Amino acid sequence: MALTPMMVEYMKTKEEYNDCILFYRLGDFYEMFFDDALTVSRELELVLTGKNCGLEERAPMCGIPHHAAAAYIPRLVTKGYKVAICEQLEDPKQSKGIVKRGVVKVITPGTFIDSNSNLENDNTYLMVISEHEDKFGIAMSDISTGEFKTTSFNNIKMSLLDEISKVSPKEILVDNNISEDLLEEINNVLPVLITKKDFNEFLVSKEELIEQFSDLEVSGLTIEREIPSKVLLKYINETQKMSLTNINLLEQYEIINYMTIDGNSRRNLELTESIREKTKKGSLLWVLDKSATSMGGRTLRKWIDEPLIVKDEIEKRLSGVEEVFNSIGFNEDLRSALKEIYDIERIVGKISNKNVNAKDLLSLKSSLDKLPCIKKLLKDTSSELLKGYYENLDELIDVRDLLNDSIKEDPGLGLKEGNIIKDGYNNLVDELRQSKLHGKEWIAALENREREFTGIKSLKVGYNKVFGYYIEISKSNYNSIPEGRYIRKQTLANAERFITEELKVMEDKILGSEEKLINLEYSIFVEIRDKIEKEISRLKKSARIISDLDGISTLALVALENDYIKPEINTNGLIKITDGRHPVVEKVIGKGDFVSNNTALNQTDKELLLITGPNMAGKSTYMRQVALITLMAQMGSFVPATSANISICDKIFTRIGASDDLAGGKSTFMVEMWEVSNILKNATSNSLVLLDEVGRGTSTYDGLSIAWSVIEYITKNKNLRCKTLFATHYHELVKLEGILPGVKNYSVAVKKLKDSVVFLRKIVEGGADESYGIEVAKLAGLPENVINRAREILEDLESKNTFDINKLSSCSMVSNNTKEIAADSIKNEEDKVISNAQNIDVNETNCNYNEEKILKIETQNSEYEETIKFLKSEIKELQESNKKHNKKHKDASNDNMQINFEVMEKENFIKEISDVDILNLNPMEAMNTLYKVVTDAKKLQ
């Protein structure tokens, strides 16, 4: 059986857009067929039906009314689907045969703007990633605002992932030949829709790129920036089915001009969303975003995501905030005007996309009405930033006047319903309106006349789109109708509808006038829209100034409300904060209840602050507080402190909190080590590093060794030595102060009471001598008998603890800055093992065992002699292996330094042997111990 002609056309269109859900217009509905119908029915919970399409079985089908599409499409796009809208391109009444249809738009996660959502303060970025030789190239665009920018950088995977984390695009385009490993890592950072294209074929020409932007902008592109820009423009044109005039500026930027914050650090610092709820509330953005406009909200988020690292730029923004901060009346007047401004950027985007309506243009007019007032307020400002805003703000008087003269104050909802153009703007519109008005008056007069003539008081003249005008008389009055006066038109359950020749003639006149008026108003509206479209560059420029001005005004307002101060900025490595506060925590618990703290970091004696103290005492909050104050200062904001002098940081890294990647097969400890490794590889001497509880995911001594080794790596590596806050439970590490350069002990103050402790939340100089873990457990409500037993166990363990950091700190350090046990320490352990074995009194052992299961031993003396001989040979091999390992690492470059886990494993193995109490083992236990030693030794080879 063959498909019906309509389904043949459908299949052709579907084949062209096979990666999309096809919304196929049939009359007043969008219909979906086959797999699309199954998907949409499942995702939108719609009834699945069927349609005869010429095949043996009915095709699965579901549909939605065309006027309700705006409610359904966002739900599909949010789930990561693309939707192709196929419309009827001709009037079905006038077509012969199959109605001509075509796809008018493809809606994807990266190109969809939902004006009804609550995310108007967020950008919707579409990103293209390309690789060219040894560089990554990126291009991105938000078509709703017209933003289009590109950058490139060395082929360093972490830089790419950091940029993706920062931009948070809704959709990513990659080349077909991208490696699966890189694709997986991108998905791990941001699970969004990724579309593959052949970048050799899917791109516009250089001439098309120049036509969209300018010869000057395009000629300045390197090849690694040109390719993704061409691909991005191609994708936008393909999905929008038109060239967007609001995308008219191609910006280039360098990632090194902004602070680098990796994805983990953004999450740990809760910059734009909280870790727990994944919402804006509880984040830094939640505290700072008191913006008056949607544009200002997007700008503030961008400033948080991209702190500056150029001193002049930071101080320029700070000076602007300071001027507004010092003039409360000025800021109140400014914000009063800003609150009347709509989202000009996105209105301009609608104008460009040809989907703007009359209400949007009214919103634009209202916004432009406020520009002269804002310019007047800026006239007497003195800071460089605000003066620049004053000089460059275009009031757009001509555009405002055009809108004021042409668009009605209460326009109709739809462009094809009329009632858009103001009286007096067009003579013909005025004439047609008069004709329409007279027609309505004639209808009212007809109704009164017929009521009097027939004596039927309930008679009425009505109208609907199907039957036109009619005279309606209830059936109870049917006998009162004069014979031959009316022509029956429609019969209802309780009434009859009629017409007269006179009414039919007038209907043609009235409806003719209405149709002409609607068509005329629409054509005039299009002319007005096109005139405004020519001024898009001016509109975008003023919108950018308004959004930046709103950002400055908001930062000044937040500083005033929360008692923030202007920070000083330096480049000499000094971070000095007096009475610093966590901006989010103090907002949640109240400023009066928050305990402020001082911070002093420098490049001499306070390079690494080693912070000890119990859980729940505030160590993590304090560390995040320092990072947030630094970030706020570099974004140009005032900060929560009584004074602050902040050295510019190129990067912020954090390793805070416990997390795992079970799906990726990574334990909590493995994830922790990966994060630490990433920090040690990528931090510089100008970075700020926050490390919280490094090593807690493994055994005590392993964790202590790793934590200690990391501290050494940071402080002794001349290429690193970054500003570091290092919080730990290992209070044994406090002895590193004075041994390692730049290490300074701090702790959380604790007040000891008779049966409990009080955490004072105050960071003070000096290390903690205990962890108070049992007190925290008590606060958490553990049973009293558990607490008491824990105290007993703690006392017993502490009495047996022989860990001596001074002994370890005297050991030599290999070239990779990782502390290893020196040769003499190894020898001591070996001697202990041999001594234990040689002092065995074989006469004390007497046992029986199964001769079939183990080798026959002639005498107990020979058994122990063999055991001792083996242990000596194993220790000798370990000595030789350790010597070779040390020599290998001595020759290694400092640039490739890594924590030596292999050596640590061997050290643990030797310690395990030395702890064996051979004197108390029977022959069977001795043989089992020997077997385990051999097995473990082989694993270390």
UniProtKB/Swiss-Prot annotation:
Membership in a protein family: Belongs to the DNA mismatch repair MutS family.
Record-given protein name: DNA mismatch repair protein MutS
Binding site for ATP: 613-620
Lineage, opening ranks: Bacteria, Bacillati, Bacillota, Clostridia, Eubacteriales
Keyword terms, alphabetized: ATP-binding, DNA damage, DNA repair, DNA-binding, Nucleotide-binding
Entries under InterPro entries matching the protein: DNA_mismatch_repair_MutS (IPR005748), DNA_mismatch_repair_MutS-lik_N (IPR007695), DNA_mismatch_repair_MutS/MSH (IPR017261), DNA_mismatch_repair_MutS_C (IPR000432), DNA_mismatch_repair_MutS_clamp (IPR007861), DNA_mismatch_repair_MutS_core (IPR007696), DNA_mismatch_repair_MutS_N (IPR016151), DNA_mismatch_repair_MutS_sf (IPR036187)
Functional note: This protein is involved in the repair of mismatches in DNA. It is possible that it carries out the mismatch recognition step. This protein has a weak ATPase activity.
Species of the source: Clostridium botulinum (strain Alaska E43 / Type E3)
Gene Ontology BP annotations: mismatch repair
GO molecular function: ATP binding; ATP-dependent DNA damage sensor activity; damaged DNA binding; mismatched DNA binding
One Gene Ontology CC term in the entry: cytosol
Pfam families noted in UniProt: MutS_I, MutS_II, MutS_III, MutS_IV, MutS_V
